[in-house]
Amino acid sequence: MKLATYNLNGIRARLPRLLEWLAREQPDVVCLQELKCADESLPIADIESAGYGAVWHGQKGFNGVAVLAKGDTPELRRVGLPGDPDDTHSRYIEAQVQGVVVGSLYLPNGNPVGTEKFDYKLRWMERLCAHAAELLKEERPAVLCGDWNVVPEDRDVFSVRATQHDAVMQPEARQAWRRIVHQGWTDALRAFHPSDEKLYTFWDYTAGCWQRDLGFRLDHLLCSPEAADRLQGAGVDKWARGEEKASDHAPTWVALG
């Protein structure tokens, strides 16, 4: 099973790129983020024509997440992250595909630091930490994947000095990330590329970041022990970022046996 995560930065604007990537890479399961699209406006017919069933949690103009499965419709388990019934942001959806629990998440960016946006990010991460612990109790293959908006280590960004004030770099966010990982989750991409220094998944549109490879590793796939036992590979489809009118993120994937 090839399971991928892809922040589209607008599904309607990037639909040609999504369909091109699906046809070329043929992933079995896809977690999408930043649909920026209401439920009724999702181009589901195009997705189905590409051979994928889908469940989704949309929001007009912002956020939005989905899970796609090739030749099947994912079994929906949860819409929204537990812990705050007043949170209306469409940032989490969970489904089951071929016995694997898949969570597609779009973690809050948190900028600017020192505002309610950053506080919300940390609260959201605490809720995710609690939910991740509950998932592990099920003792089944599970993968939490998406745009985490966290740079885990200094080597996961092109320049610490240039980005030190960004919310994705803050110690509180990194500590929250580690609390989740230390529950027993495996950072699959780093596990297969332990020494890579430019293991990026995101390149900003501004200042020629893509052309100069000034990137961040923001998109992660965390595997439960039962999923980690089946890991066969992981990578980044970097070519997709270089296409015309591409998302600022590249698809990132794991292979499970």
Describe the function of each predicted region.
Residues M1-G10, G99-G114, C145, H249:
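Active-site-proximal beta-strand elements of phosphoester/diester hydrolases
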Residues A50, W124-L218:
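Metal-dependent phosphoesterases centered on the DNase I-like endonuclease/exonuclease/phosphatase
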Residues P82-G83, P108-M125, R161-D166:
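Surface-exposed cleft-lining segments at the edges of enzyme active sites
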Residues G235-G257:
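Surface polyanion/phosphate-binding segment centered on an Asp-His-Pro turn
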